[in-house]
Amino acid sequence: IEKDKLDYSVFLPLNLYFDNNTPSELDFTETPNYNYKRSYIDYFMNLDKYTLYNKENINVFFEDSLRGNFNKLNKLLDILSNNLQQGYTINLKIRGYASQLADDRYNVKISSLRIKSLINYITSYSKGALNQYLTNNKLNIVEVPLGESLSLENKKNSSMMNIYGTDAILNRKVSILKIDAYK
């Protein structure tokens, strides 16, 4: 198998952000196909709450990073779908992160749930167009639920800033880190 020269670098790393404590196991219990789109919409609905606690360009984050990266994800999935239709095998490496507010065990669990919500979104994207490729191993996803981010974030005195502060916001994410295509 030869590695093809498809270039996805314009998309990478693709960071997709999550509100505090989302998704939860209950989200998946109530909605087994709970996916990132739902998390994205729910997060956007909390913009006013984040604005109360965080004046540091929060609107820029919500527009550029949250909305912008969701749109970028959809463009990437369209391209991947086309490449898969052309006979490529594609491997995605996805890493989940959490802020430092909770303990390590919880952070690994929520990171894993975040990855699961993204995989569910990929599965449901464009009426399930990518499903067959996941089933026949033409689209492979390597999951790395890291837990707590490797950033230099310090625990602050204010628990509200541990939820609404810039460091916490930027650490609650799933990143598509690597994409390899083979033909």
State where each predicted segment sits:
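Short, solvent-exposed loop/turn segments at secondary-structure junctions
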Residues: Q100-D104
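Periplasmic OmpA/Pal-like peptidoglycan-binding modules at the C-termini of bacterial envelope proteins
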Residues: P13-L16, N20, E25, N83, ...
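Short, low-complexity, polybasic intrinsically disordered segments
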Residues: Y106-I119, M160
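Short coil/turn segments at secondary-structure boundaries
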Residues: T29-P32, Y106-N107, K156-N157
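Solvent-exposed beta-strand motifs enriched in subsets of small alpha/beta binding domains
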Residues: I94-Y97, S111, V144
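An acidic-aromatic substrate-binding cleft motif
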Residues: S9-V10
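Periplasmic peptidoglycan-binding/anchoring modules of Gram-negative envelope and division proteins
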Residues: D4, F18, S24-R95, T123, ...
